[in-house]
Amino acid sequence: MPAPVVKKPAAKKLPAVPESKLKFSKKQISKRVAESKRRLKKAAVIALRKKENLVRAEKYQNEYIKAEQREIKLRRLAKKRNQFYVPAEAKLAFVVRIRGINKVAPKVRKVLQLFRLRQINNGVFIKLNKATINMLRIAEPYITWGYPNLKSVRELIYKRGFVKHNRQRVPITDNFVIERKLRQAHQIQCVEDLVHEIFTVGPNFKYASNFLWPFKLNTPTGGWRKKANHYVNGGDFGNREDQINRLLRKMV
């Protein structure tokens, strides 16, 4: 007698996935892949920039050391020959406003506006030439200024540096703040580039200094004591030459 035929249960059909859902899933996967590629590319660019910035910083440091050694050598040579060593004329000044606007002459007010010194204890870097030296003389009773060294320039930018972005005052928190504004047109992509351009008064000094927001400094310990007197007479205003660096130690 033949064995009874056992019917196999029909396989359950999976519900069909709507075409719209399949398209959406495919789109999401494509988005994730694109985002992943974008992140990898960005990480590679950041790594490259970091490497470039380290190379630049090292190059600048060597340049500063060589310049200092050359200066020392020239001083020693002059001393050996019983001569006076005359250093090169300063190209860079740092200017600080020390007085308010009461009874300010229109010419003085205009100079202070051009220098962007709108408040007491505001400071800016200025390229020294015939025009700016004349402007400094006009505004002299309201400002003090001098020749900043590398340490002062660095401390000002690293500790007190703010830049202009979309008309806003933005702190220098990383190199990207500088790169997005100055890299393409002016080859300045990191803080050390900015320090170098300012300190050496490079070809892009105008753009670098205008990019920096005027520095807001502390009042020096004890305050401004003799604003009405020139620095050479024991007062506060006027050219301090290299002694501006001592003042900046108290204000940064």
UniProtKB/Swiss-Prot annotation:
Keyword Calcium in record: no
UniProt keyword Nucleotidyltransferase, yes or no: no
InterPro entries in the record: Ribo_uL30_ferredoxin-like_sf, Ribosomal_uL30, Ribosomal_uL30_CS, Ribosomal_uL30_euk, Ribosomal_uL30_euk_arc, Ribosomal_uL30_ferredoxin-like, Ribosomal_uL30_N_euk
GO CC terms in record: cytosolic large ribosomal subunit; cytosolic ribosome
Entry-linked CDD domains: Ribosomal_L7_archeal_euk (cd01657)
Gene3D superfamilies cross-referenced by the UniProt entry: 1.10.15.30, Ribosomal protein L30, ferredoxin-like fold domain
One Pfam family of this chain: Ribosomal_L30_N
GO molecular function term, any single one: structural constituent of ribosome
Organism superkingdom: Eukaryota
GO biological process annotation, one example: cytoplasmic translation
Keywords noted in UniProt: Ribonucleoprotein, Ribosomal protein, RNA-binding
Function of the protein: Binds to G-rich structures in 28S rRNA and in mRNAs. Plays a regulatory role in the translation apparatus; inhibits cell-free translation of mRNAs.
Similarity comment text for this entry: Belongs to the universal ribosomal protein uL30 family.
Protein's name in the database: Large ribosomal subunit protein uL30
